Amino acid sequence: MRSSLLFSVLGLATGSTFARHVHQMRADFNSAALPQAHSARGLPAADGKKGVLLMNRIGPSSSELYIANADGTDERKLLGNSSSFEYHASFSPDGQWVVFTTERNGDGNSDLYRCRVSAAANGTCSDLEKLIATPSVEDAGALSPDGTQLAFVSTENGYKTNIWVQDLATGERRNLTNTAEIAGDPLLPDGYFRPSWSPDGEWIAFASDRNTAWRGHGNGTGWEHTQELSVYAIRPDGTGFREVATKSGYCLGSPKWSTDGKRVVYYEITVEDTWNAHRPESVAAVTSAIVSVDFETGTDRVEHASGSGLKMFPQWLSGETDATDNIAYLIKGNDNEGYNYTSGATAAVKAAIRSPAWSSDGKFVVYEKVGFTARAQEKPLYSWDEDWEYRSTDVFPQLSLQGRLVITQKQLGNSSIVSMNPDGSDLKLVFDSYSTGELDSALVAKGLAGAFQPAWSADGEWVVFGLGSWFQSRATGKARVYRATSNGSYYEALTDGTVHSGFPSYSPDGRYVAFREWGLRYGIRILDLETREVRSLTNATDNLPFWSPDGERLVFTRKVSSTNFDVATIRPDGTDLQILTSSGANDAHAVWTADGRILYSSGMYGFRDEAAIYDQTFQPYGQIIVMDADGSNKRMLTDSLWEDSMPLYVPNEFLV
């Protein structure tokens, strides 16, 4: 959601008066400056669909499972040439099966499969079997000790992540945690993650953030949320729910059992570091510990591994249960990245892997290797709405009334602005982000600066946008509102840079530009392009204004409290303010559909996995929702494990 919501705390800016003499510059573009298209070009309109829903996803673009000996030797692909997009694997207690999550049914749709690995030495699985596949998230599967039941997490029936158990013989499944006794406050985090069976099959341990606070990173100042997890247990029939371990100010995740069932081990990390753990600029400095407690009492706390490094995915090996036995775990993100063992009997293995899990005898380890190459423009995605075909786009897509698509090439280029046909063909450069010499190339490379949120004029002749430093670099950088001709021949600055200004939108009649200011002043401003006069529409910490197609209202994001942002609308004369969302989590980056509905991104259903497990993301809980202009009829349009945002409907008439 950060690619779409990213501009509230990290991108708010405002400005109010401007010199009438704006900077005017002739664009001198060199064809060599044109960013790489990376586009799946010319995809036709989908048969039987109304058109395409373009959206952006922040998450890995590839993930492949591997199996190796515990010492790292004899590594091979688990699925051989049958690999698709798989992750989060685990062995059955008898070592005969590996359960894993796969998106082979569509990019973004996570389902659970298993394969037989009794002949692991030959390097590949056999007997590939689908366990559960629905449009909801299914993840983190774990087989019971007797092999008859599957514990897993799912967002089915309410979109929040809960612990489920499925009978493998009958297919019957039940939700263990979404009950009146267990479910937390619906306005607070209420997710349940990473189930693990006790050796006797009598208990399932898991982590949960139920009834914790929505808390921003940076001591509550950041837009993106941290996560506070405790360890809980429940019986497979849904009874006996209780807390096993908790620690104020800390996140306790991925619990696993000792082989005699007397202790539970987990990783322990500060709540603040759950943000740093999935940010590439900070993960190397994160420290965590591997800790266990007595299951019955929650006491007798033992630290098995501590010191520098982010340590995760602990798992007991060899059957011993005292403080000197062997626990395997992952080190993520620093120079020692790979997997390690507390006993020292097996040497540490340096490897760029994620989510390792070991066979119960400790002989084999399974894990994934992920890639983050940007998805191609127009790459097909899983579609949750049968009327629309979902495809990938770079950020800030907008369709002109003439049917031309404009985007910022943040993932596929250098945050310049390009236009194209909606099928990805006929790519043209509108504005090179380096044209004015204002941007720091290092910040552009990190995605912290660029030409953001291009918006069309009604006649398709102009594109307005913000140019400058964004996110955390906004605090010391500048940003101005610009516009450029759609053919890239000319551009001009519309604000003078005195106040950080950005995220503009054209009025339907083409006379006005709405934008936000941040820093010296806050709020939404409206610039009259004929007179160059500016007036204040709001004076709060508002952001991301967008004019409705009929010009009667603007939708925007408002900071309604120190920890929460909501979607609001207002008339262009400043009257009739309406707050349309109230989830308790962030709701933001709203845009209008052509028929006057509102698309936006939301964290209202909470995290889909433990926050520290993610990589290179901002708000991994972000999903896309559509609602009517008055805030009614809210409906989820995505249900993935990843950060989804930047929606745009493209009707078939523009794709043929």
Describe each model-derived feature in a short phrase.
Residues 88-90, 140-142, 194-196, 254-256, ...:
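Conserved beta-strand position repeated once per blade in WD40 beta-propeller domains
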Residues 619-656:
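Blade-level signature of beta-propeller repeat domains, shared across WD40, Kelch, NHL, RCC1
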Residues 69-73, 116-121, 167-171, 235-239, ...:
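Short loop/turn segments that connect beta-strands within beta-propeller blades
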Residues 31-70, 74, 83-90, 393-398:
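Beta-strand-rich domains and repeat architectures in extracellular enzymes and scaffolds
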Residues 57-64, 80-85, 101-113, 131-137, ...:
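A flexible loop/linker signature enriched in serine peptidases of the S9 family
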Residues 47-49, 93-94, 145-146, 199-200, ...:
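Residue-level detector of Asp-centered blade-edge/turn motifs that repeat once per structural unit
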Residues 1-21:
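Fungal secretory targeting signals
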Residues 53, 98, 150, 204, ...:
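Hydrophobic beta-strand positions that form the internal "hydrophobic ladder"
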